[in-house]
Every structure is written in structure tokens, then in C-alpha cells.
Amino acid sequence: MESGFTSKDAYLSHFNPQDYLEKYYNFGAKHSAEDQILRHLLKILFKIFCLDGVKGDLLIDIGSGPTIYQLLSACESFKEIIATDYTDQNLQELEKWLKKEPGAFDWSPVVTYVCELEGNRVKGTEKEEKLRRAVKRVLKCDVTQSWPLGAVPLPPADCLLSTLCLHAACPDLPTYRTALGNLRSLLKPGGFLVLVDALKSSYYMIGEQRFSSLCLGQEAVEAAVREAGYTIEHFEVISQSYSSTMANNEGLFSLVGRKLSPCV
């Protein structure tokens, strides 16, 4: 791939969703840093969506990638979910799981873990079907555009969720701030913003392919979120980092904010 920050075209050409899933989401297969991080993220998302009152009618997941782990607790608190991504291959991988097609990634170990977190109220198969029913649409998304979902008519969302996306989509802080502002147009006043992303990372690996990452610190993230028109209700740092062969991050963070209402 070209030098410099990984371009959008490079993602279309070089991002392999099957390799990504196998490297980062092969849950329970080994006691790896990736396994521990996924456990942390599932616990955080369970707390946000099942304990902390982040709920509503519509959640839009920005940059879903080929993954569904981030939606397993969210589907308990939102009636409808829209999944989005920039790359066609990730959208196809999502559709494969939603439609139970042959070769779809096996999320059942992750689903079982989330069911345990939620008190085993339902079996894993029931949880999977609930999420499939909740995901109403899978759409193309580009956070660098003023209208990230294009001209698709949608009601304003009660919550925007974005996990491990913006650090890879934004080459610099001005673009990051602009992306947060662009996303704001999708959210109703008072609606929730939930971000999970890597801290102090400049790259991540999928096999031999190296992808750029925007080096984000807590202060920079908080400043960008506020400048884009959100309040911050909660910020948590996860000290666990990925394996040194996978990425060079220094932990991750989760943030819950809300879109400021317009001044009267």
C-alpha cells in the first residue's frame, strides 16, 4: 500500500474482513491481549446499554466493520439498529451473518459471554435472533462527508455508536473534529454519542497489511467532542493494549456524550 495515512481506496482494495475477524475476534481461543480487550469492551457496552440508561428507539452504528459484538447489548435497549460501513466487503460480511449464510463468522462464543453478563435471561441463539430482527438496514457510510449516510432519508437517531472506527477513518485531528460534527447531523438533540477507540496508536496490522491509525490522546478526544457540539458524561480509559505484533496503541477509551440542544 501507499506511504502516508491509509486512504479510503486502500481500505476498499486491501481490507480483508475474514482476516480481521480471525485476528481480533477469535474469542476464547487463546488468552491473548485481543481476547482481553474484547472482554473489556463487551463489559463496557453492557454497562452503557443495560445499566446506565442509554436507550431509545433508533441506534445508528457508525463504521460497524464486519463485526456485531458492539450491538449485542445495544439490541436490548433500542428497538431498531442501523449498521453502517465504508467498505463493500464489510457490508457483505455483515449481511452474511444477518442472513445466516454459509461461511459467516461464528460469533456464538461472544454471544454466550454477553448472555452471561446480562444474567442468562436468554440463550445465545435467542440473542442472535433478537439482534438480527433489530438490525433493519445495512448502509454505506463515509464520516468525512457532510452527510455521512448520503441522501438516505432517516429519522434522527437516539444514539450514535462508533467502535474502533474514527481512528482509522481520520488522518488528522481537524478531520476527526469535522467527522464528529458531520455525525451530529444524524442525532436528535439530547441524543447519545458512544465512542470506543484506541489511544496513542499510529497503526494496526491485519496479517501483513498495515493500516494507519490517528494517534489520539484523552485531552484531544474530549476537546474534539466538545467542539463538535456534544457534552461529555463519562470517559473511561482501558489500560489493556493490543499485542505488539498487532498494534502500537497505549490502551483504549470509552466515552458517553450527548448532543447539545440548540440555544433558544
UniProtKB/Swiss-Prot annotation:
Domain of life: Eukaryota
EC annotation from Swiss-Prot or TrEMBL: 2.1.1.1
Subcellular location: Cytoplasm
Post-translational changes noted in the entry: Deiminated by PADI1 and PADI2.
Subunit structure: Monomer.
Transmembrane segments: none
One function term, GO molecular function aspect: nicotinamide N-methyltransferase activity
CDD domains: AdoMet_MTases (cd02440)
Main location group: cytoplasm
SUPFAM superfamilies referenced in this protein's UniProt entry, alphabetically: S-adenosyl-L-methionine-dependent methyltransferases
Gene: NNMT
Recorded family membership: Belongs to the class I-like SAM-binding methyltransferase superfamily. NNMT/PNMT/TEMT family.
Name of this protein: Nicotinamide N-methyltransferase
Intrachain disulfide bonds: none
GO biological process: methylation; nicotinamide metabolic process; positive regulation of gluconeogenesis; positive regulation of protein deacetylation
Residues carrying Citrulline: R132
EC class of the enzyme, as a word: transferase
Reactions performed catalytically: nicotinamide + S-adenosyl-L-methionine = 1-methylnicotinamide + S-adenosyl-L-homocysteine
Physiological role: Catalyzes the N-methylation of nicotinamide using the universal methyl donor S-adenosyl-L-methionine to form N1-methylnicotinamide and S-adenosyl-L-homocysteine, a predominant nicotinamide/vitamin B3 clearance pathway. Plays a central role in regulating cellular methylation potential, by consuming S-adenosyl-L-methionine and limiting its availability for other methyltransferases. Actively mediates genome-wide epigenetic and transcriptional changes through hypomethylation of repressive chromatin marks, such as H3K27me3.
PANTHER family, per the entry: NICOTINAMIDE N-METHYLTRANSFERASE, NNMT/PNMT/TEMT FAMILY MEMBER
Keywords carried by this UniProt record: Citrullination, Cytoplasm, Methyltransferase, S-adenosyl-L-methionine, Transferase
